[in-house]
Curated annotation (Swiss-Prot):
Subunit structure: May form a hetero-oligomeric complex that consists of six subunits: PhaAB, PhaC, PhaD, PhaE, PhaF and PhaG.
Function summary: Part of a K(+) efflux system which is required for the adaptation of R.meliloti to alkaline pH as well as for the infection process during symbiotic nodule development.
Gene Ontology MF, one: potassium:proton antiporter activity
Protein family: Belongs to the CPA3 antiporters (TC 2.A.63) subunit D family.
Topological relation to the membrane, as annotated: Multi-pass membrane protein
UniProt keywords, alphabetically: Antiport, Cell membrane, Hydrogen ion transport, Ion transport, Membrane, Potassium, Potassium transport, Transmembrane, Transmembrane helix, Transport
Bilayer-spanning residue ranges: 4-23, 36-58, 78-100, 113-135, 140-162, 175-197, 217-239, 251-273, 283-305, 312-331, 335-357, 400-422, 442-464, 484-506
Gene from which this protein is expressed: phaD
Entry protein name: Probable K(+)/H(+) antiporter subunit D
Domain of life, source organism: Bacteria
The keyword Transmembrane belongs to this UniProt entry's keyword annotation: yes
Amino acid sequence: MTDWLDHLLILPILLPLAVAAVLIPINERDRTLKGAIGFASTLVVFILSMILMRLAAAGTGSLPGSGVYQLGNWPAPFGIVLVLDRLSALMLCLTSGLALAAQAYSMARWHTAGHHFHSLFQLLVAGLNGAFLTGDLFNLFVFFEMMLAASYGLLLHGSGPLRVKAGLHYIAVNLAASALFLIGVSLIYGAAGTLNMADLATKLAALEPRSRTLVEMGSAILGVAFLVKAGMWPLSFWLPTAYAAATPPVAGVFAVLTKVGIYVIIRLHLLVFGTAAGASSGFGQEWLVTGGMLTIAFGGIGVLASQAMGRLAGYSVLVSSGTLLAAVGLGHDGMLAGALFYLVSSTLTIGAFFLLIELVERGRDAGADVLAVTMEAYGDFDEDEEEEEVGAAIPGTMAVLGLCFCLCALLLAGLPPLSGFIAKFALISGLFDMPAAELATAMSAADWTYVTLLILSGLAAMIAMNRIGIRTFWASIEGTIPRVVVIEITPVVVLLGACIFLSLQAGPAMRYMQATADDLLAPLTHSERVLSAPRAGSQ
C-alpha cells in the first residue's frame, strides 16, 4: 500500500489509540499539555471523519480501497477488515464531533477531577470508531470491550458516592452483557464457520436448518448484549442513574454510547437477516417493535416523573433508543432514512443537554436539589408565595443559558422548525409512504401505536422541560448567577448550532440519509464489495 489514502480508514482508530499510550506517562501536573494533545488528536480524528464522510457520500468508487481496509493484506473472510460505507462514516463523524465538544468542555475544570482522564477519553474514541468500522463480530467484541473499559474509568471520574454506586452497577451490568456477547459469537462461529458479517450474510440462507437455528440463537444472545447497551426496556434500569451521576463531559459523550447498540442492531438486522437471509429474513423483528415501544413508554413516563435534569436527560436517552429500535423493527423501508436523521439529531441534542445541565444547576440554591428529590418522591407542594420583584432584568449569562435550554426543549419535544420535528415528521411520513387507498388496510395496529407513542413522548418531553425550566429560570427564590467561562458554553452552542444547521440543510441531509438507507437495503451488494475487495498491490 503505497498510497497514503489507503490508510485513511485505520487512522480514526490508530491515532487516538497511540495518543492514549503517549499521554499515560506524562505527569498529571501537566494536565494542560495532556489536554492540548488529547484535544488535537480528537480534532484530527474529526477532520479525518469529515473527509471519509465526504468520500463515502461521493460513492464507493472514490473511497480508498473501495472502502475496505485489509489488515496485513489478508482478504475477507480470512483476515481482519475495516469497512467504510455511508452509515459507518456518519457514525464516525457524529462520534468525533460529540467527543470534540465534550473534551473542550472538560478543559475548563473537569479533566482535573481525576487521573488519566484524557487517556481514557482517547481509548473511548478509539473503541467507538473501531466498533463502527470493523467488518467482523470478533473484532466488534474487541472494540466493544475497549470502549467499555474506558467508559468504566470515565464514569468513576470525579469520585463521590453517587458516581461510585452508579459506576459499580454500570460495570456489573456491562460485564454480564460482555459475557453474553462472547457466548453469542461462539455459537455463531460454531454453526456458520465465519464471523465476518458480509460472509455470514451470504452463507446464512444456505445453512441447514439445525445450523441456522444455532445462528439465530447466537444472534439472539448477541442481540440481548447490545440491547442492554442500547437501553431497551427492561434492560435499561441502570442507564438513567448512571448517566445522571457521570460528570458533564462524560455524560455528554455517553450520549453516543447507546447508539453503538443501535448501530449493531441495524447492521445485523439489515445485513445478516436482511432480504437475502432466506427463512431467517426479519429474525427478531417483533421483539424490536415490542421492546422499542415499551422503551418509549417507559422513557416517557420517566421523563414526566423526573424532577432533576440529569435523570430527565437519562430518560430522554431511553426515548431516543426506543424510537430507533421500533422504527427498525417495523420494517418499513421508507422509515429508515428518517430514523437515521433522528439518530443524529437526538444524539447531538442529548449531548448538548448533558453539558448544559451542570452550567444551569451551578447557580441554583443549595436546597434546590433536595427539593427536587423530595418532590419526585412525595409530589409537588402547594405553596403560595408572593413575588418580591416583577420585571427584573435578566442577566446575560442566564439569558444565554435560558436560550440554550429552550432550544434543547424544542429539540427533545420535536417541535417545529428544528431538526427534532423534521426527524419525527420523516419517520411518520415514511410510515405513511404508500398509496392513500392502501392506508386503511396496510397500516397495522403496531404502526398506529408507534405514531401515538411518538407524539405522546414529545408531549411528555415538552411538559417536563417546561416544568423544570420554570422552576430553574423563573423561580421565586433567587439563586446566584452562575459563573460560566467561554470554553464551557461554546461546546453547548456548537452542538445546538449543529442541530440548527441540520434543520436548515434538511434537504441535503435527508438525501444522504436516503442514500445510506438504500445501501443498507442492498445487503448482497455490500457483501460482494467486502468479499471481492482486491488485495493491495494486485490492482
